[in-house]
């Protein structure tokens, strides 16, 4: 791509991938009974797999996780682009060649049948593998946090001058303590993002600015004990790589926050589930290019007993059972919190609720305040919700595969 025009480079890349796939599937591998293709991507894999299945008399099974043309539309200026329309036709035609289909949501299975005439799709929801689970052992938790602390560069205490006078006393904010739990002043919030246009990271930044205004407003003087504060400090760890990461990291450097620390990290594969296992709250900014898929990261968070704040879109209700007490709240720029009546009057949590859904930074900030209020004394809604998730039976991927997917191949 450094030496050729973009379109020509893409054509050459597709041709090379086509030859590699044809060789591997037609010559290098023995004749299969089934070919399972997860999509997207679909170019050139759709056409190659369909051809190989025809020649070698194998069954073509398509695992629909999203639609490639909708992802292309994010980069090509919308679904009206001629190239996007062509990609949609290709995906539809190739999809109809499948002998069996999996869909990740009920809504996607319905859409495939109604819009593309692809019926009989088996709904196969994602589920976390067994190694995603809560870490409640305090020794293991402390060991992990201490090991990650140098990479995250967590401060121990923040001081903010009250004003410009030389004799002014600094405002000393609570220390950033993550252990032991009984003296914990800091809630660990984790978000995994691909740093792409379908995940608006700016919403999280704006919400944290509003939360910081609320938490900073309540502080007056020193806080020698954790239970002197109503709202905890936040250590927000954002994992993942992607094209927009540098842009948002630049913006993060210019934030002046008193009670919130933001860190980006790329973790080893074995550390990511452990980080989820010791965290207090998860955030998902995924909104789906098609509006029909669900974020795998939320399944992983639930597998670790982690309540989630997720961006609101049509099918997210298939995964996140919303605590409606905090829906529609807001936070003003001066730190004023407005919660719905149910959130203000201590209404009981909705049965089975495992998170909240937000549509704006102000609503997300209000949910952070509502869920984390009382965190330092162990009486927050987030902690109660996490306890319920940890105790609830968790469906795992192995069970999903054996009960739902395997019969398609037998």
Residue ranges of predicted features:
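Short N-terminal targeting/anchoring amphipathic segment
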Residues: 23-45, 58-61
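A charged, aromatic-enriched C-terminal amphipathic alpha-helix characteristic of glycosyltransferases
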Residues: 357-369, 373-410
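Helix-loop-beta element that forms the nucleotide-linked donor phosphate-binding surface
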Residues: 102-103, 108-162
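Conserved donor-binding/catalytic core segment of Leloir-type glycosyltransferases
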Residues: 148-163, 171-199, 205-209, 237
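A conserved mid-protein helix/loop that constitutes part of the nucleotide-sugar donor-binding site
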Residues: 194-225, 246
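Membrane-proximal helix-turn-helix segments that form the acceptor-binding/catalytic region
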Residues: 44-47, 51-55, 62, 68, ...
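Nucleotide-sugar-dependent
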Residues: 199, 268-275, 280-302, 310-318, ...
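Nucleotide-activated donor-binding/catalytic signature segment of Leloir-type glycosyltransferases, i.e.
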Residues: 227-233, 237-240, 245-274, 330, ...
């Amino acid at each position: 791509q450094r030496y050729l025009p973009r379109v020509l480079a893409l054509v050459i890349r597709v041709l090379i991938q086509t030859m590699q796939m044809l060789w591997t599937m037609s010559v290098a591998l023995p004749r299969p009974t089934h070919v399972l293709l997860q999509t997207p991507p679909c170019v050139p894999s759709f056409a190659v797999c369909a051809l190989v299945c025809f020649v070698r008399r194998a069954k073509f099974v398509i695992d629909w996780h999203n639609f490639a043309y909708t992802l292309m539309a994010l980069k090509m200026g919308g679904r009206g682009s001629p190239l996007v329309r062509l990609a949609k036709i290709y995906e539809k035609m190739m999809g109809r060649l499948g002998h069996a289909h999996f869909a990740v949501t009920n809504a996607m299975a319905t859409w495939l049948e109604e819009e593309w005439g692809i019926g009989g799709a088996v709904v196969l929801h994602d589920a976390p593998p067994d190694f995603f689970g809560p870490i409640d052992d305090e020794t293991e938790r402390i060991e992990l946090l201490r090991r990650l602390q140098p990479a995250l560069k967590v401060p121990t205490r923040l001081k903010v001058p009250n004003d410009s006078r030389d004799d002014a006393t600094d405002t000393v904010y609570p220390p950033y303590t993550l252990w032991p739990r009984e003296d914990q002043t800091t809630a660990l919030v984790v978000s995994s993002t691909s740093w792409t246009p379908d995940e608006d990271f700016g919403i999280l930044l704006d919400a944290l600015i509003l939360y910081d205004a609320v938490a900073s407003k309540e502080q007056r003087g020193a806080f020698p004990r954790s239970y002197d504060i109503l709202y905890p400090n936040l250590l927000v760890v954002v994992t993942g790589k992607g094209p927009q990461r540098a842009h948002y990291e630049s913006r993060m450097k210019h934030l002046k926050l008193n009670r919130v620390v933001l860190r980006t990290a790329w973790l080893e594969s074995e550390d990511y589930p452990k980080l989820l296992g010791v965290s207090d709250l998860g955030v998902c900014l995924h909104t789906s290019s098609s509006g029909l898929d669900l974020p795998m990261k939320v399944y992983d968070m639930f597998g670790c007993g982690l309540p989630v704040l997720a961006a609101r879109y049509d099918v997210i209700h298939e995964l996140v059972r919303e605590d409606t007490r905090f829906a529609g709240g807001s936070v003003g720029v001066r730190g004023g919190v407005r919660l719905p009546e149910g959130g203000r009057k201590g209404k009981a949590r909705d049965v089975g609720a495992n998170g909240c859904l937000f549509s704006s930074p102000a609503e997300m900030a209000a949910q952070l305040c509502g869920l984390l209020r009382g965190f330092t004394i162990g009486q927050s809604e987030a902690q109660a919700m996490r306890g319920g998730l940890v105790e609830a039976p968790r469906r795992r991927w192995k069970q999903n595969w054996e009960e739902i997917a395997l019969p398609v191949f037998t």
